[in-house]
Curated annotation (Swiss-Prot):
Name this polypeptide is given: Golgi apparatus membrane protein TVP15
One of the Pfam families matching this protein, by short name: COPI_assoc
Keywords carried by this UniProt record: Golgi apparatus, Membrane, Transmembrane, Transmembrane helix
GO cellular component: Golgi membrane
Species annotation: Saccharomyces cerevisiae (strain ATCC 204508 / S288c)
Protein backbone atom coordinates (compact mmCIF):
# COMPACT_ATOMS: atom_id res chain seq x y z
CA UNK A 1 0.00 0.00 0.00
CA UNK A 2 2.75 2.46 0.90
CA UNK A 3 5.11 3.65 -1.79
CA UNK A 4 7.21 5.54 0.76
CA UNK A 5 9.28 3.30 3.06
CA UNK A 6 8.79 3.78 6.83
CA UNK A 7 12.50 4.58 7.24
CA UNK A 8 11.89 7.80 5.26
CA UNK A 9 9.59 9.11 7.99
CA UNK A 10 12.08 8.23 10.73
CA UNK A 11 14.94 9.98 8.89
CA UNK A 12 12.75 12.97 8.04
CA UNK A 13 11.51 13.39 11.61
CA UNK A 14 14.97 13.05 13.16
CA UNK A 15 16.54 15.46 10.67
CA UNK A 16 13.77 18.05 10.99
CA UNK A 17 13.90 17.79 14.77
CA UNK A 18 17.68 18.26 14.89
CA UNK A 19 17.60 21.15 12.41
CA UNK A 20 14.85 22.86 14.40
CA UNK A 21 16.62 22.32 17.72
CA UNK A 22 19.76 23.97 16.32
CA UNK A 23 17.68 26.84 14.92
CA UNK A 24 15.89 27.34 18.24
CA UNK A 25 19.18 27.24 20.14
CA UNK A 26 20.58 29.91 17.85
CA UNK A 27 17.53 32.05 18.61
CA UNK A 28 18.20 31.75 22.34
CA UNK A 29 21.11 34.16 21.90
CA UNK A 30 18.59 36.98 21.39
CA UNK A 31 17.73 37.05 25.11
CA UNK A 32 19.22 40.52 25.66
CA UNK A 33 18.39 42.12 22.31
CA UNK A 34 14.93 40.82 21.43
CA UNK A 35 12.86 39.12 24.10
CA UNK A 36 10.10 38.10 21.66
CA UNK A 37 12.51 36.05 19.54
CA UNK A 38 13.91 34.47 22.70
CA UNK A 39 10.44 33.40 23.83
CA UNK A 40 9.71 31.99 20.37
CA UNK A 41 12.93 29.97 20.69
CA UNK A 42 11.72 28.50 23.97
CA UNK A 43 8.46 27.44 22.30
CA UNK A 44 10.46 26.12 19.34
CA UNK A 45 12.53 23.93 21.64
CA UNK A 46 9.40 22.72 23.41
CA UNK A 47 7.93 21.61 20.06
CA UNK A 48 11.07 20.23 18.41
CA UNK A 49 12.64 18.17 21.22
CA UNK A 50 9.69 15.72 21.36
CA UNK A 51 9.94 15.20 17.58
CA UNK A 52 13.38 13.62 17.98
CA UNK A 53 12.52 11.85 21.24
CA UNK A 54 9.42 10.18 19.77
CA UNK A 55 11.46 8.44 17.10
CA UNK A 56 13.28 6.43 19.76
CA UNK A 57 10.77 6.02 22.59
CA UNK A 58 7.04 6.72 22.81
CA UNK A 59 5.73 7.46 26.33
CA UNK A 60 2.28 5.93 26.84
CA UNK A 61 0.71 9.09 28.31
CA UNK A 62 1.73 11.20 25.35
CA UNK A 63 -1.01 9.66 23.22
CA UNK A 64 -3.53 11.24 25.55
CA UNK A 65 -1.96 14.67 26.02
CA UNK A 66 -0.20 15.36 22.69
CA UNK A 67 -2.06 13.25 20.17
CA UNK A 68 -1.19 15.64 17.35
CA UNK A 69 2.27 14.05 17.22
CA UNK A 70 0.69 10.74 16.15
CA UNK A 71 -1.05 11.66 12.90
CA UNK A 72 0.17 13.10 9.64
CA UNK A 73 -2.25 16.03 9.87
CA UNK A 74 -1.27 16.95 13.43
CA UNK A 75 2.42 16.58 12.78
CA UNK A 76 2.16 18.56 9.53
CA UNK A 77 0.35 21.43 11.25
CA UNK A 78 2.86 21.40 14.10
CA UNK A 79 5.72 21.50 11.56
CA UNK A 80 4.13 24.52 9.87
CA UNK A 81 3.74 26.25 13.26
CA UNK A 82 7.32 25.33 14.14
CA UNK A 83 8.57 26.74 10.84
CA UNK A 84 6.95 30.07 11.62
CA UNK A 85 8.41 30.08 15.13
CA UNK A 86 12.03 29.37 14.16
CA UNK A 87 12.26 31.53 11.05
CA UNK A 88 13.62 34.60 12.87
CA UNK A 89 17.33 35.30 12.81
CA UNK A 90 19.99 34.52 10.24
CA UNK A 91 19.95 32.68 6.96
CA UNK A 92 20.18 29.27 8.69
CA UNK A 93 16.94 29.89 10.56
CA UNK A 94 15.19 31.02 7.39
CA UNK A 95 16.35 27.91 5.50
CA UNK A 96 15.40 25.67 8.43
CA UNK A 97 11.98 27.31 8.54
CA UNK A 98 11.47 26.78 4.81
CA UNK A 99 12.54 23.12 5.02
CA UNK A 100 10.24 22.54 8.00
CA UNK A 101 7.34 24.25 6.22
CA UNK A 102 7.78 22.12 3.09
CA UNK A 103 7.91 18.92 5.15
CA UNK A 104 4.82 20.04 7.08
CA UNK A 105 2.89 20.53 3.85
CA UNK A 106 4.10 17.12 2.66
CA UNK A 107 2.84 15.48 5.87
CA UNK A 108 -0.57 17.12 5.40
CA UNK A 109 -0.67 15.75 1.84
CA UNK A 110 0.27 12.30 3.20
CA UNK A 111 -2.66 12.51 5.61
CA UNK A 112 -5.15 12.88 2.77
CA UNK A 113 -3.40 10.38 0.50
CA UNK A 114 -4.73 6.84 0.31
CA UNK A 115 -1.38 5.35 -0.65
CA UNK A 116 0.74 6.24 2.38
CA UNK A 117 0.50 4.09 5.49
CA UNK A 118 1.23 5.69 8.85
CA UNK A 119 4.49 4.68 10.56
CA UNK A 120 4.47 2.21 13.45
CA UNK A 121 5.23 4.87 16.07
CA UNK A 122 1.99 6.70 15.15
CA UNK A 123 -0.11 3.81 16.50
CA UNK A 124 -1.04 3.54 20.15
CA UNK A 125 0.42 0.38 21.74
CA UNK A 126 -2.84 -0.84 23.33
CA UNK A 127 -5.29 0.07 20.61
CA UNK A 128 -6.38 -2.38 17.98
CA UNK A 129 -7.46 0.33 15.53
CA UNK A 130 -5.74 3.45 14.41
CA UNK A 131 -6.37 6.09 11.80
CA UNK A 132 -6.66 4.53 8.38
CA UNK A 133 -6.90 0.98 9.71
CA UNK A 134 -9.64 -0.93 7.90
CA UNK A 135 -9.16 -4.28 9.63
CA UNK A 136 -12.20 -4.28 11.92
CA UNK A 137 -13.08 -7.48 13.71
CA UNK A 138 -16.87 -7.74 13.41
CA UNK A 139 -17.12 -11.32 14.68
CA UNK A 140 -17.81 -10.27 18.27
CA UNK A 141 -21.52 -9.94 19.02
CA UNK A 142 -22.57 -7.23 21.41
CA UNK A 143 -25.41 -8.09 23.82
Amino acid sequence: MSVIPPKFFKIANISIGCIDIIAALSQLTYIFTNLNVFLLAVYGLALSVPIVYLEFKVPSNLYRYASFYFSFLGRGLSYILLSLIISFGGIYNILAGMFTFILGVAFIVFHFSQFVEEPANFRAPGSSLSIGDDDIDDDDDMI
